[in-house]
Amino acid sequence: TVLGLTAVCVPTMAQYEGTRVYDRIGHGQDSITTLGNIVAYKDSYKAQDYVGAYEPWKAVFTMAPCAEVSTYAYGAMILANVLVKEQDMTKKKAYFNELMNLYDTRLKHMDALNSFTKADKRATKGDILARKAFDYAYYGAGVADGYSLDKAYTMFREGIDLINKDGAKEVPGFVLDKFFEISYQR
């Protein structure tokens, strides 16, 4: 059961530092429902039942966007898998748009999410944009309204430039591989 409430993350670095998931999802019935949905989507995911994982994942993503950083990694994989298997183009586009929105939402809550993440595991704006560019290029052709190689290239360039500017991390190989492919195709 999904209640009509939406959680909001406040991006204050110290707010969630050192907290556990129970402290970030509230108390009472909402937290019980959210915890149940976390367990349900992870169990379905592990069984590679991505369609079964979708609804409980969506409930967690909507009600508790700062519950766990893994909500975003699992969500990207769940959405990618249901997108690929979906035959109805209207639904396929909706899943694709939801996938792109997942990255926008992660950017919006990045500081709050990073506040309870180990320093070496914290996402940067460049990391998130590069991954969004990868998924746009990989899944967007024939699905995304207004898809273009130039847009994909620009998205990659922004993410990669930010990662390189930051200097703390390397650009993941799969991102570079797709970036080179898009660069060659344009």
Regions found by a protein language model. Name each.
Residues 1-9:
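Bacterial N-terminal signal peptides
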Residues 10-14:
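Sec/Tat signal peptide C-region and signal peptidase I cleavage site
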Residues 15-186:
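Preference for long, solvent-exposed alpha-helical segments and helix-linker "stalks"
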